[in-house]
Amino acid sequence: MTDTHPGVDFMIKPEATSASKIDTAEWPLLLKNFDKLLVRTGHYTPIPCGNNPLKRPIAEYVSSGVINLDKPANPSSHEVVAWVKKILRVEKTGHSGTLDPKVTGCLIICNDRATRLVKSQQSAGKEYVCVLRLHDSVEGERNVASAIETLTGALFQRPPLISAVKRQLRIRSIYESKLIEFDNERNLAVFWASCEAGTYMRTLCVHLGLLLGVGGHMQELRRVRSGCLSENDDIVTMHDVLDAQWIYDNTRDESYLRRVIRPLESLLVGYKRIVVKDSAVNAICYGAKLMIPGLLRYEAGIEVNEEIVLITTKGEAIAVGIAQMSTVELSTCDHGVVAKVKRCIMERDVYPRRWGLGPQSMKKKTLKKEGKLDKYGRPNENTPADWSKSYIDYSDPNAEVAKPAPVVAPAAPTVEAEVNGVEDSKKRKSVESSEKDEDEAAKKEEKRRKKEAKKEKKEKKEKKEKKEKKKKSE
């Protein structure tokens, strides 16, 4: 990927309406075919922060990378992950789903920041190639093929006898399966299966043996796909990882290490994308919802409550989010929440803070200073009527535009004065009572501290006396 276009700066530029010099179908990772995304606006101010995923500094590249590892037979998944952690000298590592010690194949290992995506990878679908040993000969290959195809859809499974989890009946889905090869003389069958995460292939082999009426068990197993990465997507061995780190340590050549490790964005290629303005990136990293003004481009076919990925103009993944608007709404609305964050991926303060600089935010700050809003920005008795009518708090799910107050006939000035006087006296009383409560609480706290200090002094004296008595007795 890195050698495809060495001189090209992979970035969505402002007002990029004309076609790019190179075909965007060849652009890497999350920027692939970005010109086919629907455009909300082409105007934004680029901020010289962050890097394209393929051009990150090597330390950052390793700590936000994933490895598509070909797990060797015999060591457990946890041992392999611990070895990778030790070789690369990273703080954290995680994997995409446990493989039994004797099983080989795809094991996606996530480093440091990429471990935030481990949960989504563990729940992703898997594909296996399995060798089934039958306990007796079967009449024909067709019977085996039909039995394998019969065991598709939702199946009841109980974990095998040798398992680390409770042997509880569970339902798992087999999406597709097909026979690859059958040897009747040796009673061996090789088949491929695409299944849900958490499916026990060992149990499936036992069920196939029962279905054929001869019994059977799993002879050998290999995982050929985990989530969006398969064994054809630059799979590497433990020796490759060790050699790449050795070459970098001794020759400072990082090219081999960059080929072994791939950016975390490669795990998010299957998600629908929403491109965010640079000025809105850090707010999302702090947990804010993405609003319409921060939106640049979006994918067609987004549905409400669908999982999407929020990306920067340089193709970096900011967060995995949940869409709050469909594609149709995004094209027509001029305000509202686009998506809320499910799992933040980017570190905070990679991009500068840009929130609180708009006209509405500045007005809100001045009202807070003048005491016309409370410290949380909520209206109080001093809040101007025009502010409460016009301002909508999107953090409040029940927030609506305030309706204008009904017109009331002006009352006599004497009555108004009396009402104001009563309200003022009530306010004074409430303030005085709260001050008294605070004073009483402070006095109680002082008394408690004095008592504790006296107790400590007594205990110290008693200890000293005991020590002196012991010395005298000796």
UniProtKB/Swiss-Prot annotation:
Enzyme Commission numbers on file: 5.4.99.-
Catalytic function, reaction form: uridine in 5S rRNA = pseudouridine in 5S rRNA; uridine in snRNA = pseudouridine in snRNA; a uridine in mRNA = a pseudouridine in mRNA
Catalytic site: 100 (nucleophile)
Domain PUA: 271-346
Signal peptide extent: none
GO biological process terms on file: box H/ACA sno(s)RNA 3'-end processing; mRNA pseudouridine synthesis; rRNA pseudouridine synthesis; snRNA pseudouridine synthesis
Compartments reported by the entry: Nucleus, Nucleolus
Sequence repeat segments: 443-445, 450-452, 454-456, 457-459, 460-462, 463-465, 466-468
Gene Ontology CC entries for this record: box H/ACA snoRNP complex; cytosol
Low complexity: bias regions: 406-419
Keyword Plastid: no
Region 7 X 3 AA approximate tandem repeats of K-K-E, residue ranges: 434-468
Keywords: Isomerase, Nucleus, Repeat, Ribonucleoprotein, Ribosome biogenesis, RNA-binding, rRNA processing
SUPFAM superfamilies according to UniProt: Pseudouridine synthase, PUA domain-like
Main subcellular localisation: nucleus
Pfam families according to UniProt: DKCLD, PUA, TruB_C_2, TruB_N
SMART domains (alphabetical): DKCLD, PUA
Assigned protein family: Belongs to the pseudouridine synthase TruB family.
Subunit structure: Component of the small nucleolar ribonucleoprotein particles containing H/ACA-type snoRNAs (H/ACA snoRNPs).
Function summary: Catalytic subunit of H/ACA small nucleolar ribonucleoprotein (H/ACA snoRNP) complex, which catalyzes pseudouridylation of rRNA. This involves the isomerization of uridine such that the ribose is subsequently attached to C5, instead of the normal N1. Pseudouridine ('psi') residues may serve to stabilize the conformation of rRNAs and play a central role in ribosomal RNA processing. The H/ACA snoRNP complex also mediates pseudouridylation of other types of RNAs. Catalyzes pseudouridylation at position 93 in U2 snRNA.
Name of the protein in its database record: H/ACA ribonucleoprotein complex subunit cbf5
Organism whose genome encodes this protein: Schizosaccharomyces pombe (strain 972 / ATCC 24843)
Gene encoding the protein: cbf5
